[in-house]
Curated annotation (Swiss-Prot):
Organism: Yersinia pseudotuberculosis serotype IB (strain PB1/+)
Lineage top rank: taxon: Bacteria
Molecular function via GO: 3-hydroxybutyryl-CoA epimerase activity; delta(3)-delta(2)-enoyl-CoA isomerase activity; enoyl-CoA hydratase activity; long-chain-3-hydroxyacyl-CoA dehydrogenase activity; NAD+ binding
Protein name, as recorded: Fatty acid oxidation complex subunit alpha
InterPro entries: 3-OHacyl-CoA_DH_CS, 3-OHacyl-CoA_DH_NAD-bd, 3HC_DH_C, 6-PGluconate_DH-like_C_sf, ClpP/crotonase-like_dom_sf, Enoyl-CoA_hyd/isom_CS, Enoyl-CoA_hydra/iso, FA_oxidation_alpha_subunit
Keywords, sorted A to Z: Fatty acid metabolism, Isomerase, Lipid degradation, Lipid metabolism, Lyase, Multifunctional enzyme, NAD, Oxidoreductase
Coiled coil: none
CC terms in the record's Gene Ontology section: fatty acid beta-oxidation multienzyme complex
Protein's gene: fadB
Keyword Isomerase: yes
Binding annotation for substrate: 296, 500, 660
Pathway: Lipid metabolism; fatty acid beta-oxidation
Amino acid sequence: MLYQSETLQLHWLENGIAELVFDAPGSVNKLDTKTVANLGEALNVLEKQSELKGLLLRSAKTALIVGADITEFLSLFNAPPEKLHQWLVFANTIFNRLEDLPVPTISAINGYALGGGCECILATDFRIASPEARIGLPETKLGIMPGFGGSVRLPRLLGADSALEIIATGKDVTANDALKIGLVDAVVDPEKLVGSALTMLKQAIDGKLDWQAARRPKLEPLKLNPTEAAMCFTIAKGRVMQVAGKHYPAPLTAVKTIEAAAKFGRTEALNLETNSFVPLAGSNEARALVGIFLNDQYVKAQAKKLSKGVAAPKLAAVLGAGIMGGGIAYQSALKSVPVIMKDINENSLDLGMNEAAKLLNKQLERGKVDGLKMASILATIRPTLDYAGIERAQVIVEAVVENPKVKAAVLAEVEALIGEDTVLASNTSTIPIDQLAKSLKRPENFCGMHFFNPVHQMPLVEIIRGAKTSDKTLAAVVAYATQMGKTPIVVNDCPGFFVNRVLFPYLAGFGMLVRDGGDFHQIDKVMEKQFGWPMGPAYLLDVVGIDTAHHAQAVMAAGFPERMNKDYRDAVDVMFDNQRFGQKNGQGFYRYTQDAKGKPRKENDEQVDKLLAEISQPLQEFSDEDIIARTMIPMINEVVRCLEEGIIASAAEGDMALVYGLGFPPFHGGVFRYLDTLGSANYVEMAQRYAHLGALYHVPAGLRAKAEHNESYYPVAAALLDVSTNQPA
C-alpha cells in the first residue's frame, strides 16, 4: 500500500502501474473537501515513485464519484470570497497535478461520475466506462458552475457545442452517448471494465496509444476560428436566456466564461473559471437552489423513516374515475401497484381509462415504454362499476367530487365492505380530514392523500394526519406515495391543509389589488417576469378553474373567517357569476383557443375589463414592488402561521411543499429561505407598510420575535475553510 486514507487508497498493481481507488465510508463516494485533500496527499506519494509507468483510477463502489458533498456547499459558500477563491486554486492545483503526471492515466467509470467526479476523470488522459455509467456536470442546476476545471477541460475535449450543452443544461449523458461525443474512449461490460482499462493503459505505456496527444488539447486554447466561436457562443447564450431566463444566472455565466477562456491555455482559463465561480457561490440563487437540494434529501429521508418496515400495497383502489382518478390509477399502475378504479358512471370510467391510455401513449412516443409494456400497465388498471374485489386492496383512495356529504357517504359505504386493517385515504383539497372522519367507524385507518393536478407531473402528495389517524396508517400511505414516485410530506389537519391554505391568501391579495384598481394583466406579468412564478394569479385561477377556486375560497373563508372572509365581491365572484370558469370552458380572465397541438392558447379578452369595472376602482398602475408585496405578504404570513401552529413540522418541509406543490420559484428556495434572504426584520418593516389592508397583512407573533432577535429559519452554516492554510478545516 503506497497511501491509505479514509476515502481512498493507492497501491501498486503490476509493473509500475499504480491504482488509485476511491472508497469512502458509506454507500457512495463524494468529492468532499477531505477527499480532495486526500487526493493531494496521494499525489505527493505518487510523484516520488521513480518506477511509476501508469495510473488507473477507479471506484470500489457501484458508482465512481456521485459529485461533491452538497451538504458542505453552504458552509463553503459562507467563507469570505477571497478564501473560497484560494481554496479553489488549492483544489485545482491538485487536479492539475493529476493531469500533469509524467505517465499515462486512465479512469474506469462505473455508475455515476457527476460534478467533481466528472471533473476528476477529465483530468486523466483516457476514460473507459461500463454501459450503466452516467457522466455530467449538474452544477448549473445548483446555481453555480463547474469549479474544478470542468468548464476548461470539457470544451477542449469535446468541442464547444457538446460541452456547452452539457454544462448549461446540467444534464448527464449515458455511456453510449458519451462515447459518441468523445467523452469516453470505450464502453465495455462491467465485468471487463478494470481489465480493459488496464489493457488500454498498457497500450499507452507501450506507445501504441499516444497519451500525450490525448492530453495536449486540454492544456491549450480552444480550437475555434473567430466565425465559429461567434456563432457557437451567440446561439448558446440565446438558448440559455430563453430556457433559464434572468433569474438563473449560472448557465449564462458558464457560457460567457467558456467563451472568454477559449483563447487561453489551461492556467489562464482556470483563473477565469474560479473568478466566475466565486460570485455565483455567494449568490442568493445558489443558496436557494442548494437549499432545495438539501431539503429534498431531508423530506425523502423523513418519508423513508416514517414508512420504515412498511411495504407498498400489492393492490390499491381509487374511488372516482375521471381525469383525477384516472391520473392516480395511471401513476399507481406505472409504478407497479395494480389498481381497481371504481365509479358509478360508465362514462367516467371511460374517461379515466382514456386518461391513463393517453399518458401511456406519450410514454410510448418518447420511447419510455414499448407496446407490450404499455398493454401490461393498462391491464393492471381494473375499471369497475361495483365494489367486487375491493376488500383485497390494502390502500383505497377516495377521489370523488369535492363535496363533504358525498365524500363522507362514499367513505362510510366502502368502510363497511373492507377489513379492519385496510387503509382509507381521501384525495380532498380543502375539506378537513377530521370532518370526514366523523362518518367512519375506524378513523384511525383514515387520512388525507392530496394529489396535485396533473397527477403524473406534480411531484408532491400532501399526506394529512387527522386527530385520530394512526402512525400505521400514515406509514402505509407514505409508502404508497413513495412507490408511486411522489414526494410525500405529512401535514396536520386544518381547512386547506398546507398548500391550499397558503395559496388562498395569495389569491385574496390579488383580489384586493384588482379591487383597488390593479390591472390583472400587469399583476400577472410582474408575478411571472419579476417574482418568477410559472404563471401569475389570474392565469393560475383560469388553469385551476374559477368554479373550483370559488368553492375553495368559501371553504377557506369559513375555516379562517378572521382573515379570509371578505365583505366585498371580488374578481373571482365576477368571473364565477358570468360563468367564465377558465380553461375548462374557454373563458376566464383570459380567452382560450386551441393551438395546433390541441393545447389551450391564452389570449386577451376586452370583455373582462368591462366586467371587472363593476367591482374595481378606476384602473391605476401599481409599482412592481407594490404588486409583489400585496400578493406575497398574505401568503408568507400564512406559511409562517402554519409552522407556528404545527401544521407543517419544519421550514424544509414547508419550502419543499411550496416548490413541488405550487411551483414556488426555485431560485427563491421557498418562503422560509426567501425570508432568510430578505432578513426577518426587513420583511416585518415592509409588511408594516401594508398592515392597514387587513388581517392577512398582519405579521404573526413568532416572526416578529425572530425579527427582534435577528434570527433565521435555517441555521447559518459555519465556514468550512481553514483560513491559515486555505485548506479544508
